[in-house]
Design a protein with these regions (language model features):
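DNA-contacting surface of Y-family translesion DNA polymerases
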Residues: 1-121
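Acidic, metal-coordinating catalytic segment for phosphate/diphosphate chemistry
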Residues: 95-187
Length: 187
């Protein structure tokens, strides 16, 4: 300690403490989320496409809402299917950054359509949004996104004021048990 203090002055003691692993500053864990996801395992395996699409729509809508609440955008959508024989298949697609339902739900449905090929009972479905970045939604210059964005903003405000299930797409209303909390803030 004395040698370090002679060489480095008042910082010598700090260097010695750090070399000994002595540090009384608080540990502040922080890790940026890399993805958000949700899955649903069915009580009874099913081949009911209406039910599966309803649940996937509700999941995508919920995750997109979580992205917007956390001021995040996703660039990768993954859909997962596990069949009754426990074979699990996933498919993903890279997309332009988005957090808007009208962009994400059709991609989820397309991936589901590509994945559901085996004609077996489905045990589990899931969705993951990854490659997350901070940011708001980018509007396209020549598309009519403004009305849709305003609709999403209004729906989000209603959800924040009256609860997450205050406004739902009709197709997703059967998915009554989709959890709706914000993984970015823990709310």
């Amino acid at each position: 300690v004395e040698l370090l203090q002679n060489v480095f002055g008042k910082h010598g003691r700090d260097i010695w403490k750090k070399a000994q692993g002595i540090d009384h500053s608080p540990v502040i864990p922080y890790q940026e989320r890399k993805s958000i996801s949700t899955e649903r395992t069915f009580e009874k395996d099913t081949t009911d496409h209406v039910k599966l699409k309803s649940i996937l729509t509700a999941m995508a809508e919920n995750l997109a809402y979580q992205l917007r609440r956390g001021n995040k955008l996703t660039a990768c959508v993954t859909v997962k299917i596990r069949y009754s024989d426990f074979q699990t298949y996933t498919q993903q697609r890279q997309i332009p950054y988005s957090a808007m339902d009208h962009n994400l739900i059709p991609i989820v449905m397309d991936l589901y359509k590509n994945l559901y090929q085996r004609r077996l009972l489905v045990r589990l479905v899931g969705i993951r949004f990854s490659n997350l970045v901070e940011g708001g939604q980018q509007m396209h210059l020549f598309e009519n996104d403004e009305k849709i964005a305003n609709l999403s903003i209004a729906m989000d405000k209603m959800r924040q004021r009256y609860g997450d299930r205050a406004v739902l797409r009709a197709v997703g209303m059967d998915a009554k048990t989709i959890g709706r909390w914000n993984p970015f803030t823990g709310e």
